[in-house]
């Protein structure tokens, strides 16, 4: 099934640029059981149910919000078969009034470029990478053909940056290396691919200052605010949101790990110019997705 937009972007209140589909339509989980348990413990999720695509869609539909949905193909590095991206795209197509699918490819597999092309043909609107889980340095030129294919399709690429809850608390972090998610590696990619829109996912602790500098320096680089409640944002990031990052920051939760209602409540408690809110919650995401920003009549 091919995805096409069915969203009334003028009517929705927010675009969450960062949500995970944990379980595919076949009941397969995106991580193995040990990693699932550790991740849920890290985020203090308790009995919160795993999110399938249809459940996620209804959750956002009830809140008049749109969700970008994805999974992560890290089979080579993690030894765990990924969720079906075709299943995710089909689920987004069923719920195209509220969901936007991003693709995923394993950069370490020879068919990565071909997989990009296949998923573009199915209608994905961007691609998600997790360098630490996928065990690759984004600025290694071996992976540049992947970015060439994404750039040629006119789509954005979203990269995990900074600390990760995946593997946290386990011996050796389950083998996951944080250095792959240093945003300075993406500075190289952004310079070498000026026509590729890049989103750095999460406040990139412990590299937040570098992340702010990169987003401010390069017009093709944005950052999303997922993975943390806004009340835990580093103070320099909060300052930047009202200044140099007001047109570069995107609303994102990391759902189901961070719930939308909690994130919005904590964001509203920040001392920010009210004019910044519509930029972060919707308008900046529309620009990243290559969509027009609706104007309000009157």
Regions found by a protein language model. Give the residues of each.
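Conserved, mostly hydrophobic/aromatic
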Residues: 18, 119, 127, 150, ...
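Generic structural signal for hydrophobic
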Residues: 59-60, 119, 150, 189
């Amino acid at each position: 099934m091919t995805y096409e937009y069915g969203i009334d972007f003028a009517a929705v209140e927010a675009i969450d640029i960062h949500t995970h589909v944990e379980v595919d339509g076949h009941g397969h989980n995106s991580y193995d059981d040990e990693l699932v348990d550790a991740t849920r413990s890290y985020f203090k999720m308790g009995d919160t149910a795993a999110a399938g695509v249809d459940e996620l869609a209804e959750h956002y539909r009830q809140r008049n919000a749109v969700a970008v949905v994805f999974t992560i193909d890290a089979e080579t590095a993690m030894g765990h078969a990924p969720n079906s991206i075709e299943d995710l795209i089909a689920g987004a197509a069923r719920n195209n009034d509220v969901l936007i699918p991003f693709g995923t490819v394993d950069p370490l597999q020879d068919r990565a470029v071909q997989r990009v092309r296949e998923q573009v043909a199915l209608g994905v609107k961007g691609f998600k990478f997790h360098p630490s889980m996928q065990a690759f340095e984004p600025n290694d030129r071996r992976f540049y053909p992947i970015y060439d294919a994404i750039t040629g399709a006119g789509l954005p690429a979203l990269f995990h940056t900074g600390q990760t809850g995946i593997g946290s608390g386990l011996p050796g972090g389950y083998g996951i290396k944080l250095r792959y998610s240093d945003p300075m590696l993406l500075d190289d990619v952004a310079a070498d691919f000026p026509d590729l829109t890049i989103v750095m996912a999460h406040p990139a602790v412990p590299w937040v200052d570098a992340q702010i500098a990169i987003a401010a320096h390069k017009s093709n680089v944005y950052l999303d605010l997922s993975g943390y409640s806004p009340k835990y944002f580093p103070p320099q990031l909060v300052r930047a949101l009202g200044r140099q990052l007001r047109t570069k920051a995107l609303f994102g939760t990391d759902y189901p790990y961070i719930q939308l209602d909690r994130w919005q409540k904590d964001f509203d408690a920040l001392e920010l110019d009210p004019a910044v809110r519509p930029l972060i919650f919707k308008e900046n995401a529309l620009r990243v997705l290559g969509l027009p920003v609706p104007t309000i009549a009157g």
